[in-house]
Amino acid sequence: MIDIHSHIVFDVDDGPKTLEESLSLIEESYRQGVRIIVSTSHRRKGMFETPEDIIFKNFSIVKHEAEKRFEHLQILYGGELYYTSDMLEKLKLKQIPTLNNTKFALIEFSMQTSWKDIHTALSNVLMLGITPVVAHIERYNALENQKERVKEIINMGCYTQINSSHILKQKLFNDKHKRFKKRARYFLEENLVHFVASDMHNLDVRPPFLAEAYKIICRDFGKERANQLFIENAQSILKNHYI
């Protein structure tokens, strides 16, 4: 499997704090069958502002150690880019990374971002010649039960990603992700999803659930669809090809 959304670099955002935590997280992902992980540390003005050179330095350490430790594993560079006008300028100047240096970039919004602002933001990124991969679409209130809006995003030329944790079965009680899980299922049933990724941050609260999610998609939507969502579509964009 291929994971295009992960927080595996230590001491740069709200992901791992140490190199050992990074490697433990990667080990769990590897155990689940992932062989390519794109590191997408947060870039968010006012919240995650680690200098680019530090992120890349720590990424390089993680990549070297992980690829040495785990056979046939590839760690690639990217970022989860929170949309602001400042981010757009940095993307234009190539000061922040796309996914594996391709024309595809992982773009994030706040849960409360309006539909108008999401639409405008994605249009602005597309005008740079960069295709947005919209991170965890199930988190945005403006898209809840709004298949026409998501179709419009896709028809503009964007791709969509949902988190593997939100594919899992709802807990009977106190499932704080219940709303996200319902939305993710809705988008899957409407065939509006291009990628499932882990968005893993740590082993305690936000671990990877790719193996479990893959089984559920196979069972409910078929193996062919599962392979597209977990492997084939990601292979395409990481080679800089459209899906």
Curated annotation (Swiss-Prot):
Its EC number is 3.1.3.48. One of its GO terms (biological process) is capsule polysaccharide biosynthetic process. This is Tyrosine-protein phosphatase CpsB. The lineage of its organism: Bacteria, Bacillati, Bacillota, Bacilli, Lactobacillales. The keyword Nucleus does not apply. InterPro entries: Caps_polysacc_synth_CpsB, Caps_polysacc_synth_CpsB/CapC, Metal_Hydrolase. Pfam families: CpsB_CapC. The gene is cpsB. PANTHER family: TYROSINE-PROTEIN PHOSPHATASE YWQE (PTHR39181:SF1).
